[in-house]
């Protein structure tokens, strides 16, 4: 039976354990994701508390991260989504981007830092592309490309 969380506390605590183990074992999210049958972005978001994992995928990542049966069950629960606190936009279109950042923001940050190092993706030296494409299931889809220059953090 599918279970749902009523607060972020349990998933946040598990996410902290996961990131600590990932760091200690020198694993990448790509390595943790191998064998799940899911995208690395989805699995990363799940490990950071933003999605439930299917049972098989939860067991695969648990084996790599030395997680117990309680953690495997917790990874399968529907989380309280949104990892970035703050004000909420009211425009419906803008809100959807806010929602995307709430769900995937911590995932994007983790994957950018993992692939590029400590730094940011510039919104100044930046390209944005939006394309409308047909959805094979009917209707349309929006393909949005965010292309920003990586800027490393420089110690001083």
Curated annotation (Swiss-Prot):
GO process annotations (BP): cyanate metabolic process
Active site: residue positions: 96, 99, 122
Function according to Swiss-Prot or TrEMBL: Catalyzes the reaction of cyanate with bicarbonate to produce ammonia and carbon dioxide.
Pfam families: Cyanate_lyase (PF02560), CYNS_N (PF21291)
Protein origin, superkingdom: Bacteria
Designated name of the protein: Cyanate hydratase
GO molecular function, one term: cyanate hydratase activity
CDD domains: Cyanase_C
Gene3D superfamilies: Cyanate lyase, C-terminal domain, lambda repressor-like DNA-binding domains
EC number: 4.2.1.104
Family membership: Belongs to the cyanase family.
Catalytic activity of the protein: cyanate + hydrogencarbonate + 3 H(+) = NH4(+) + 2 CO2
InterPro entries reported in the protein's UniProt record: Cyanase (IPR008076), Cyanate_lyase_C (IPR003712), Cyanate_lyase_C_sf (IPR036581), CYNS_N (IPR048564), Lambda_DNA-bd_dom_sf (IPR010982)
Organism: Burkholderia thailandensis (strain ATCC 700388 / DSM 13276 / CCUG 48851 / CIP 106301 / E264)
Alphabetically ordered keywords of this record: Lyase
